From Swiss-Prot:
Swiss-Prot/TrEMBL keywords: Host cytoplasm, Host mitochondrion, Host-virus interaction, Inhibition of host innate immune response by virus, Interferon antiviral system evasion, Viral immunoevasion
Species in which this protein is naturally found: Murine pneumonia virus (strain 15)
Protein name: Non-structural protein 1
Subcellular location: Host cytoplasm; Host mitochondrion
Lineage: Viruses, Riboviria, Orthornavirae, Negarnaviricota, Haploviricotina
Main function: May play a minor role in antagonizing the type I IFN-mediated antiviral response. Additionally, NS1 may serve some inhibitory role in viral transcription and RNA replication.
Length: 113
């Protein structure tokens, strides 16, 4: 049980992806994921998009709350040097192209000012 989450970071015309599977998700999980990203003090035309793949309503609410928490606490900052090419890091560690899934649901999008 659970669902898949995809995060996309667009920067300078390039896109980076992170995909992971969650069963029980809370704010600290998202904070842990974002902690590895380098945080800058200025916006540089970047966008962070978070997608939920699946329809597990029990997981949707805490993920949205976590994303809003990150947005509120990091307003005016942006993430850089997250990943350097278009890949998905699967649970097995294999690199694959990001999936094209029209049923993906956009949960939150943080756009630089």
């Amino acid at each position: 049980m659970g669902c898949n989450v995809m995060m996309e970071l667009d920067y300078g015309g390039r896109a980076a992806w992170l995909a992971f599977h969650i069963t029980n998700f809370d704010r600290s999980d998202l904070e842990t994921i974002l902690r590895g990203a380098r945080v800058c003090n200025t916006w540089q035309d970047q966008r962070l998009s978070v997608y939920l793949v699946g329809r597990d309503c029990n997981l949707l609410r805490p993920f949205v709350q976590a994303a809003k928490f990150i947005h509120n606490t990091r307003r005016g900052q942006t993430l850089t040097h997250w990943f350097t090419k278009n890949i998905v890091f699967s649970s097995t560690g294999q690199e694959t192209e990001p999936p094209i899934d029209p049923t993906c649901e956009l949960l939150v999008e943080l756009i630089s000012g």
